Every structure is written in structure tokens, then in C-alpha cells.
Amino acid sequence: MSTMTPREIVHELDQHIVGQQDAKKAVAIALRNRWRRMQLDAKLRTEITPKNILMIGPTGVGKTEIARRLAKLTNAPFIKVEATKFTEVGYVGRDVESIIRDLVDSSIKMMREQEMTKVRHRAEEAAEERILNALLPPARGEDGAVEDSSTRQIFRKKLREGQLDDKEIEIDVSATPVGVEIMAPPGMEDMTSQLQNMFSSMNTGKTKKTKLTVKKAFKKLTDEEAAKLVNEEELKAQAIDAAEQNGIVFIDEIDKVAKREGNSGADVSREGVQRDLLPLIEGCTVSTKHGMIKTDHILFITSGAFHVSKPSDLIPELQGRLPIRVELQALTPDDFERILTEPTASLTEQHQSLLATEGTQIEFTADGIRKIAEIAYQVNKSTENIGARRLHTVLEKLLEEISFAAGESDNNVTIDAAFVDGQLGELTKNEDLSRFIL
């Protein structure tokens, strides 16, 4: 679990997302409260439940990006899903309980990676011995014990220095289970995975001789040895506990399952999904192939644009289970300008690096960047507001000719206001054209 303070979390999010301080603060506090809760005694800890969040804001302002960046910071089981993927229980499609099953799978994967990192050094030593045995069968003393001869030591030194990387050896490796693809109706993924596990376990313990280069063999054998050193039962127990106590679920597009005013008829993927989400968010027990999972302390962060529906269109019970509401602001020309320059690996930096691989150097001037920002804002205003994603469209159109001719000759291009006007001026003046091209 992350031990970062709210200020540190916001600072980290600032490296990638411009503005939206309210949303950043809300998720930072929610994340820190997970750590604070774990410092309490067990009796009080069970009483404190997470305060779930609803993020509201137009498309392209950073809701999903906050989730993506948060996933990298948390060091806790994290899963991002779209509400539109699920249907009411009893209908064809995935039911919402599969969210928790996926969270547990994600937790097990995360824990396995952590445990394998811990035993990596021992696994590498064991893999080294197996490779040396293949290169140079060990000499045995009179008592039958393996002796580390001077020749073996020379080979060990060469192996560590990478001098034997390209040499081919024949080794025994675990046989890869035959992939059994089972087609099952939507919503029965749990049964499918159990059947696949049953078939794959039939091959457990079998080995086969394979020819590999020393470099590839070392990686494969290290992974194999690390897997042997990890206690699977203990790992699963830790993973289930981590998912229950520190798990975070981010549900995007929650507005798409809100029932719109004046819209009657059977809303299979709407109100039913909301009702199914209620017990999950409130706290219930979900059956998975790894055991029973309690959702009482899982943090749910939901987000939606709500440009057709309103947060009040969600059923009242669901609104009550999302007590913290954060509104994200629409982007201004100043925000667009900052998005183009401030974040780590900004859009301008990405395009410069891509074209530099072919010897084309492009330089963005301050007035050029301002002009791009103003055009993106103007097109959003006059057509459809898609937020920061508009910058991708504008930049691609702006650099189309340069990108097409890159590599034909080494040249330097300065992107200033005049250049931007020359490339995009006509498009922005003609609303019909910008509607289709930008």
C-alpha cells in the first residue's frame, strides 16, 4: 500500500494532469485514509468504511487519466472497469460481481510479482547452477558430493559477464500447458476459468527438453525457480486480504447507466445494473474461485460526463452510497496551453521525439503553442466539446505534411503562430470543414 501523503499524491498527479485540483485532493485524501485506517486497532478498523467518490465532469478533462495514474501510485489491488460492460443479473452479459473476481485476480497477480521479486536472487543462483550443469556436468567426489572445479568457476565467471549469452544449450523446462479455449455464455466466466485450470493442472510437473540460447534459458529458468520458491497458498491468502482491505475499484461511464428523463421501457443495462451495484458498494460477500470476498472495505471511485443525464438520475440509494462528489472543470485555452508543455512526456515532446528519429527537428514557439491551444478550444466550443482529446486531432492535422516527408531530408521546422495559421487557418474559419476534419 502507498504511504504517500495527500500532498505528495497531488504533486505526483500534477506531473501528468493539468488542473482539476478538487478531484486530485479528493482521491488523495481517500487514498491516504486507506493507510490511516490500517494504523488503527482491529476493533475500530472494522467500523471505518471508505467514503466512495463520484467524479462529475465533461469528457476529456482528466477523469480517466486520474484513475490510470492512481493505479500506478497505489501499490494496492486496483481495477478500472466501464459500467456499460455490465448487465442486470439474469440477462446475457457480465454481471457486476465479476468486478470483484477481476479485482482478486489482479491482487493475486500483483502479490505474485512482489513475492517473485523477493526470491529473485535465490532463483537466479539456482538457474545459474542449472545452466552450468547443462554446459559442464558437475564433477563428483569420492563421497558422491558435487565438486566446484576450477573449470566450472571459469564458466561461471563467463556466464556472469555475458560471454556465453549466444551459446545454445539443451535444458529441461516445465512443459507449457496445452491451451484449452472454452467458449462459455457471457456471465459464466468463473466456470470457464475453473475448467481451464483443471485442464492446465493435468500437465503440472511434466518437463520437456528445449534448445535455447543461454540468455533466454537464464530468464526462463529464473522464472521457473522463482515460482517454486513462492508459497501459492500463502500468496492467495495475502492477496485476498489485500483485495478486501485495500482494494480500489474505479467505475467509469457511470452516467451511461443512469435512467434518462422521459425514457421509458426495459432498461436492461441501466437501472438493473445500478441495483446490482448497490450491495457491492454497500458491502456484501462475493463468491470467487479463490474463496469468499467481503466488499465492505473496498473503495469505489465512479466517474461520468453526465452531459445527457444528471447525477440525480441515478437511483437515490446509489447516490447515497457515493457521498463525496467532485466536479471537474471544463478546459480553458490556458489549460490547453499548459497541457501542451507542462506534463511529463507532453504531447509536443512526444511529437518532437518521434520526428527526431528520422532527423527532423521541430521546435514549438510560445506563440505557436498558444495558437494551437486557442484553435483546440475554439473547435471544441463550435462543434462538440471532447476536452483535451481535441489536441491530438489538431496536432496530427498540423504535423501531417512534416510527418509524411520526414526522413527524406534532414530539416528543422519552427512551429510558430504563422505556421499554425497557414496549416489550420482555413479549417477553423469554415465550421463545416472543422466539424469533419478537426
UniProtKB/Swiss-Prot annotation:
GO annotations of cellular component type: HslUV protease complex
Subcellular location field: Cytoplasm
A molecular-function term among this protein's GO annotations: proteasome-activating activity
Single Gene Ontology BP annotation: protein unfolding
Primary subcellular site in the record, as a coarse category: cytoplasm
Keyword line: ATP-binding, Chaperone, Cytoplasm, Nucleotide-binding, Stress response
CDD domains: RecA-like_HslU (cd19498)
Disulfide bonds: none
Chain residues that bind ATP: 18, 60-65, 252, 317, 389
SUPFAM superfamilies: P-loop containing nucleoside triphosphate hydrolases
InterPro entries according to UniProt: AAA+_ATPase (IPR003593), ATP-dep_Clp_protease_ClpX (IPR050052), ATPase_AAA_core (IPR003959), Clp_ATPase_C (IPR019489), HslU (IPR004491), P-loop_NTPase (IPR027417)
Subunit structure: A double ring-shaped homohexamer of HslV is capped on each side by a ring-shaped HslU homohexamer. The assembly of the HslU/HslV complex is dependent on binding of ATP.
Family of the protein in this entry: Belongs to the ClpX chaperone family. HslU subfamily.
Record's function text: ATPase subunit of a proteasome-like degradation complex; this subunit has chaperone activity. The binding of ATP and its subsequent hydrolysis by HslU are essential for unfolding of protein substrates subsequently hydrolyzed by HslV. HslU recognizes the N-terminal part of its protein substrates and unfolds these before they are guided to HslV for hydrolysis.
Protein's recorded name: ATP-dependent protease ATPase subunit HslU
Organism: Saccharophagus degradans (strain 2-40 / ATCC 43961 / DSM 17024)
Taxonomic placement: Bacteria, Pseudomonadati, Pseudomonadota, Gammaproteobacteria, Cellvibrionales
